[in-house]
Amino acid sequence: KKVLVNDIEACYINLKGAETLNLDNWDGSISLVKYVYANTVLDKEDKDCVVFLEFVNFVNRMVWLSSTERLRSLGTDLPGGNLLETICNLKDGAEELEAFLREAGLAFNLVIRDKGEGKTIYCKMGKREVPFAPLMSSGTRSLVFLFLWYMRRTSVSFVFIDEFDAFYHTDLSIAVINKLLAEEHIQVVFTSHNTDIISNELLRPDCYFILEDNIIQPFCDLTDKALREAHNLQKMYKAGAFHE
């Protein structure tokens, strides 16, 4: 059953509570879904309306992250501005970040200090405390981005991480993937150019996709072979087994 249609031939809504909505006022500057959601009081007892509202709720909790650009989001408001200041305002922020980085194999002793210019994070190095920001490599900064999302993960439905391991070595990439796999109630999609993470031990063949010429296809649809756990997916990929 179609409850909302917007194409060349027709544009209509079939939801209880939207019968009197005037589509002449919709100028296309926002999606039709968002327009309906913002301008109607739908019947929450109607199953079609329930599905529509659940869909909107899911989309509003989608997040897009990029390791090579600034932190951005779709629907969900994630903290912006100075990363370390934001973490300082989290409960046990420095301790949580330290533990998160240790899981990734990075050992820092982090503390929050305010030395006259606002709160920020310092790193203990022997008897000295030095600002953490100048110590962060590109990879560490990328992990801090990821940490900010991770602390908000209970409010997120779907996360897309573009070039998630652009600044990671392979072991760190695998550690991050395993961290994400442990989250059962979030769908995660990430992109990478690192073929060293193509492994049956990490993900099933139907979880690996090739994106090329605006077409995305899973490995399992790109070969006639029955892919088994013993297969070396990376070796097959490099040999061209998944290129039509």
Where are these regions (language model features)?
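Conserved ABC ATPase signature
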Residues: 115-151, 155-158, 163-168
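C-terminal lobe/lid and adjacent interdomain/linker elements of RecA-like ASCE P-loop ATPase modules
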Residues: 114, 175-244
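Short polybasic amphipathic segments
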Residues: 1-3, 10-13, 117-126, 207-210
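Short, solvent-exposed loop/turn motifs
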Residues: 9, 20, 128-131, 215-216
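A short, sequence-level motif marking secondary-structure junctions
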Residues: 18, 133-139, 220-226
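Short alpha-helix of the ABC ATPase nucleotide-binding domain corresponding to the H-loop/switch region
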Residues: 169-174
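Short glycine/proline-enriched coil/turn segments at helix->beta-strand junctions
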Residues: 106, 153-156, 183-187
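Electropositive, glycine-dotted interaction segments
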Residues: 1-109
